[in-house]
């Protein structure tokens, strides 16, 4: 392992395990470390180690932009949920601010778009009509598991993306995996858990189902575009918080049945 990678991983380890071990930057190019963290959307994690580095000012500026984007997406999440819940449309918040809540500083987890899952077909169709009626514009995209919408706040001109999922993940070539995923994440099977974020209560996947979803989500990223440290941090921090509520026997069985056991190390 290269020294640069070792230093970066130690910084992530400190974050994910709540450690405060010193991470000397001797022998590591700070500019290269900055670029690596930027590539993995984790620049704010460098703040405790970069106070004496020439990149510190740029690092603080980038962090401020991430904080602004975080709260803007939180507002977009709240707005979208309020529209759907007002019409009694059952939906689940995937990833996003629900995973960021597990970080020591949630705002340091970079957010991209908003992902919602609606397992009921009729409810999904109703949701699409409601979104269209409230200024959400459907974006052309080839997807086998979600519809993409774009919403622009007229006051600021800032636009945000919503991925509205009718399947939890894309379709596999292995039919048994599709059958199992459809069964586990069906409307009849799923019973929501709830998290309170900034005074708003959101329905989310139960811990066992969420771990299984995150494994499939990581696999899809690995197969099509690769994945970086953010997904691993998400997974680690989620398990740190919810491991006692996860049925690992079920995870073990589901992973074997869907042929993704190579991504899951059962201990």
Residue map of PLM features:
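Conserved NTP-donor binding/palm subdomain of two-metal-ion nucleotidyltransferases/polymerases, i.e.
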Residues: 1-112, 118-267
């Amino acid at each position: 392992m290269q020294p640069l990678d070792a230093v970066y991983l130690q910084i992530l380890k400190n974050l994910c395990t709540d450690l405060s071990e010193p991470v000397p930057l001797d022998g590591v190019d700070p500019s290269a470390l900055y670029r690596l963290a930027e590539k993995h959307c984790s620049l704010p994690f460098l703040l405790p180690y970069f106070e004496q580095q020439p990149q510190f000012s740029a690092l603080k500026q980038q962090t401020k932009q991430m904080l602004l984007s975080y709260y803007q997406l939180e507002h977009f999440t709240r707005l979208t949920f309020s529209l759907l819940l007002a019409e009694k449309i059952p939906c689940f918040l995937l990833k996003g601010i629900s995973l960021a809540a597990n970080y020591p500083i949630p705002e340091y987890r970079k957010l991209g778009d908003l992902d919602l899952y609606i397992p009921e077909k009729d409810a999904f169709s109703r949701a699409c009509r409601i979104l269209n009626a409230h200024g959400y514009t459907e974006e052309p995209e080839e997807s086998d598991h979600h519809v993409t919408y774009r919403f622009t706040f007229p006051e600021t001109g800032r636009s945000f993306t919503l991925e509205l999922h009718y399947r939890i993940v894309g379709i596999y070539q292995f039919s048994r995996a599709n059958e199992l995923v459809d069964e586990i994440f069906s409307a009849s099977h799923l019973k929501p858990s709830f998290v309170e974020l900034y005074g708003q209560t959101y329905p989310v996947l139960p811990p066992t189902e969420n771990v299984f979803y995150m494994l499939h989500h990581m696999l899809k990223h690995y197969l099509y575009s690769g994945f970086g440290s953010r997904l691993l941090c998400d997974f680690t921090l989620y398990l740190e918080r919810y491991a006692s509520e996860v049925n690992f026997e079920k995870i073990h069985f589901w992973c074997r049945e869907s042929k993704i056991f190579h991504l899951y190390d059962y201990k």
